C-alpha cells in the first residue's frame, strides 16, 4: 500500500517536526505500507484564512496528482482540513483528514469533546468544520492558545519554546 501524506509545512522550514512526524507515522504503519511525505512551500506559518485557502488549493492539486500516480490513499495532515471536500471530489483515491478523523475519534470516547487550537484566528474555521461535520451538539467548546503556526513548529527544535507551549497548554 502506498499513502500520500500531505503536510501543510515542509522539511526545510520545520526539520524537527518533520523528522518526528516521519518517525511516528512510519513506526505505526503496517508492514508493506509506504508513506510518501509532501510539504507545502511556502508553508502555513501564519494563522489566516487566505493562507489556509492557498495551502488548501495546493493540497487539492496534490490529491489529484496522488491518484494519478498510483497512490492508494491520501492523508491530509492538517487539522483545519483546508480543501478536504474539494480534494475528495476531485481525487480518484480515498482522502482522509486529520481534523475530521480526530473529531470523530474523540467522539468515540466522550459524549462531548472540545478543541484547543493554537491561535484565536483559527476558531471561526474550526466552528465551520464542526458544523460541516455535523458535530455541533458534540463539540461544545473551542479554545485558543496564543501562538502562530511557525512558533509551534520551532518548538520542536527549541526546548525553551517547547516549555512555553506546554505552559500555555496547561
Q: Residue locations for each model-derived region?
A:
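Active-site rim beta-loop-alpha module in soluble metabolic enzymes
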Residues: 130-170
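Short beta-strand segments enriched in small/hydrophobic residues
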Residues: 1-18, 113-116
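Gly/Ser/Thr-rich loops at beta-strand to alpha-helix junctions
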Residues: 10-12, 77-83, 118-122
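Short, acidic/small-residue loops that bind anionic groups at enzyme active sites
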Residues: 88-109
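A short, Lys/Arg-enriched amphipathic alpha-helix followed by its capping loop at the start of a domain
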Residues: 20-33
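N-terminal beta-loop-helix "entrance" segment that forms/cooperates
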Residues: 36-58, 150-157
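Glycine-rich, highly charged phosphate/nucleotide-binding loops
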Residues: 48-65, 160-169
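Periplasmic-binding protein-like
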Residues: 6, 67-78, 170
Amino acid at each position: 500500500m502506498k499513502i500520500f501524506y500531505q503536510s501543510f509545512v515542509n522539511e526545510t522550514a520545520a526539520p524537527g517536526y518533520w523528522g518526528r512526524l516521519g518517525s511516528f507515522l512510519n513506526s505505526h504503519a503496517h508492514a508493506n505500507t509506504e508513506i510518501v511525505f509532501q510539504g507545502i512551500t511556502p508553508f502555513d506559518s501564519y494563522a489566516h484564512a487566505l493562507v489556509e485557502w492557498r495551502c488548501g488549493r495546493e493540497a487539492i492539486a496534490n490529491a489529484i496528482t496522488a491518484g494519478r500516480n498510483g497512490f492508494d490513499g491520501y492523508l491530509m495532515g492538517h487539522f483545519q482540513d483546508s480543501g478536504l471536500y474539494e480534494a475528495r471530489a476531485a481525487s480518484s483515491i480515498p482522502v482522509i483528514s486529520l481534523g475530521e478523523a480526530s473529531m470523530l475519534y474523540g467522539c468515540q470516547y466522550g459524549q462531548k469533546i472540545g478543541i484547543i487550537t493554537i491561535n484565536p484566528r483559527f476558531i471561526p474555521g474550526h466552528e465551520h468544520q464542526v458544523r460541516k461535520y455535523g458535530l455541533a451538539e458534540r463539540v461544545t467548546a473551542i479554545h485558543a492558545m496564543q501562538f502562530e503556526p511557525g512558533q509551534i513548529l520551532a518548538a520542536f527544535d527549541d526546548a525553551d519554546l517547547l516549555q512555553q507551549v506546554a505552559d500555555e497548554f496547561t
